[in-house]
Curated annotation (Swiss-Prot):
GO biological process, any: rRNA base methylation
Cofactor: [4Fe-4S] cluster
Principal subcellular localisation of the protein: cytoplasm
Cofactor descriptive note: Binds 1 [4Fe-4S] cluster. The cluster is coordinated with 3 cysteines and an exchangeable S-adenosyl-L-methionine.
Gene name, Swiss-Prot/TrEMBL: rlmN
Note: Reaction proceeds by a ping-pong mechanism involving intermediate methylation of a conserved cysteine residue.
Similarity remark: Belongs to the radical SAM superfamily. RlmN family.
Name used for this protein in its record: Dual-specificity RNA methyltransferase RlmN
Domain Radical SAM core: start-end pairs: 131-372
Length: 400
């Protein structure tokens, strides 16, 4: 089924979020840089000569050991721990719902308090996808999204606000909490080995917070996920693509999904501001791109929309000269969508053509379909529940 094309003036680009972040009365230290932590220590009277050491201790306990309160930080003096507990927390987002798929995929709905007003608390999703050789965590960057991509469920949800660096890092910490994945894990392995910024929101429209969060996640003295195992996905915010390479230095993925501007204008309305030619030039200019650090182009397979062999041929032509791989994504249906997933035979033909042209073209294995694991679905479904049902979900998540 071919959806109706929106009028040209329906373009949705970067908008001011409806709300700004209101910190709790006792803010969390999660997401602060080392310099910011030193400033907070100064606020509670820690002498300048001690701050560097105390920052390193805090960093170790928060990001390497996963401490959930200051009492666990036994290498820090009791007096400083008491002052820290009086003024700050190391709280993560609250798990209000958890779903576990038959294939092992886990999806969490996380509550982000706004000040002391529980009624204004917002929720985001993150998803853990276990595979034989890795465990990938899909992380959100905004509450809702402004881009209105027609095939994406999050596009049906309004943009409420940007996440803070702490709320982004907090998703990784929640996953490690739930998976028992901190330094004291008996077998010494890690379940969360890869991070993808492919959850709710457009990361490059929340650049500073995403940058600060990913620098913390990639820090070798803490969470320690290599930057080569962190992928930032964008729908094509061209001015911030090269900047991301310079200031963050992680792997880049582009939500392409179409090879002609007319169709991409419909699927990804941001294309009307930054068309394909400009987007691909930014990819060619991305710092550090090489055969070993290829840019991933994501391409959702929509039946009768973008899955012809002519589309595959033009895709190969467009990507000439770019160190690239193409990730073909079978469409994950959601209630109310007008799209269907391409037939499997057609996906294989599309993939084979790209592969024969010299590009890696893996087909992403659909995961978590039994738990509505496509981005934004759990949030939408829980919003339909009554208050009593939501309280029951929260209790189950907390006691699981």
């Amino acid at each position: 089924m071919q959806p109706t094309t929106e009028p040209h003036n329906a373009i949705l680009v970067e908008k001011t979020p409806l709300e700004t972040y209101v910190p709790p009365a006792k803010p969390s230290l999660i997401g602060l840089s080392r310099n910011e932590l030193a400033d907070r220590l100064g606020e509670i009277g820690v002498a300048p000569a001690q701050r560097k050491m105390r920052v390193q201790q805090l960093w170790h306990w928060m990001y390497f050991r996963g401490a959930q309160n200051f009492d666990e930080m036994t290498s820090i003096s009791k007096g400083i721990r008491a002052e820290l507990a009086q003024h700050f927390t190391v709280d993560r987002p609250e798990v209000v719902a958890e779903q576990i798929s038959n294939d092992g995929t886990r999806k969490w709905l996380l509550r982000l308090p706004s000040g002391d007003n529980v009624e204004k608390a917002h929720e985001v999703e993150c998803v853990y996808i276990p595979e034989t050789d890795r465990g990938t965590l899909c992380v959100s960057s905004q509450v809702g999204c402004t881009l209105n991509c027609s095939f994406c469920h999050t596009g049906t949800q309004r943009l409420v606000r940007n996440l803070t660096a702490g709320e982004i890092v907090g998703q990784v910490m929640v996953a490690r909490d739930r998976l028992n994945d901190w330094a004291d894990r008996e077998d010494g392995t890690r379940r969360v080995t890869n991070i993808v910024m492919m959850g709710m929101g457009e990361p490059l429209y929340n650049f500073d917070a995403v940058r600060d969060a990913l620098l913390i996640v990639g820090d070798n003295e803490g969470i320690g996920i290599s930057r080569r195992r962190i992928t930032l996905s964008t729908s094509g915010v061209v001015p911030n693509i090269v900047r991301a390479g310079e200031e963050i230095g992680v792997m880049l993925a582009i939500s392409l999904h179409a090879v002609r501007d007319e169709l991409r204008n419909e699927l990804v309305p941001l294309n009307r501001k930054y068309p394909i030619k400009e987007l691909l030039q930014a990819c060619r200019d991305y710092p550090g791109a090489s055969n070993a650090r290829r840019i991933t182009f994501e391409y959702v397979m929509l039946k009768g929309v973008n899955d012809s062999l002519d589309d595959a041929k033009l895709l190969v032509k467009l990507l000439k000269g770019i160190h690239a791989k193409i990730n073909l994504i079978p469409f994950n249906p959601w209630p109310g969508t007008a799209y269907e997933c391409s037939d499997w035979d057609q996906i294989e033909k599309f993939s084979e053509y790209i592969f024969n042209a010299g590009y890696s073209s893996p087909v992403r294995t659909p995961r978590g379909r039994d738990i509505l694991a496509a981005c934004g679905q759990l949030k939408s479904e829980t919003e339909k529940l009554s208050a009593r049902e939501r309280q029951t979900l929260r209790a189950m998540a907390m006691t699981d």
